Amino acid sequence: MAQTTFSGPVKSLAGFISAGVSNSVTTAAGKTLTVANDAGKQIYYTSTATATFTLPTVNASSPSDPTDPNQSNNFGATFEFVLSTTVTGSFIVKVNSSNDTVVGTAIIGEGTTSMAVFSTATASDTITLNGTTTGGVGGANVKATVVGANRYKVEVVSGATGALATPFSATV
């Protein structure tokens, strides 16, 4: 199969493998994410300060032509975050719309002595890693994928310190 190189964002209706220097974005500040600019990229957070990353509103509209690459449905859009260092403020990932929620789990480990798995509550819409009890140690990973109407599936893996606590809440 021939190989094609694109310099701008590509929207695939059947998935693809992305690799290259533009697939990882380094930032020291939070932002409101978009599907066109941020989906499918690894966001490498390099600051210890508080930052908020706001996920795009889930768009579940059914296209009249499911093969149209310009459809607005964003099912399958994935946003991945990696912390380069332990945060001293709060690293926050939240939904943009009060209609959207997150479902998933967080695996938080404290040194070699304890580990906990936290599940989202029905109304969860925010992930907060505080650098201590809810995670946020360097190397932490947060992944959010649009999986259905008003729903993101989330996965959190992080080290922590102190008495472990859930990173999930309802704040939007």
Predicted regions and their residues:
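Short, P/G- and charge-enriched loop/turn segments at secondary-structure junctions
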Residues: T126-T132
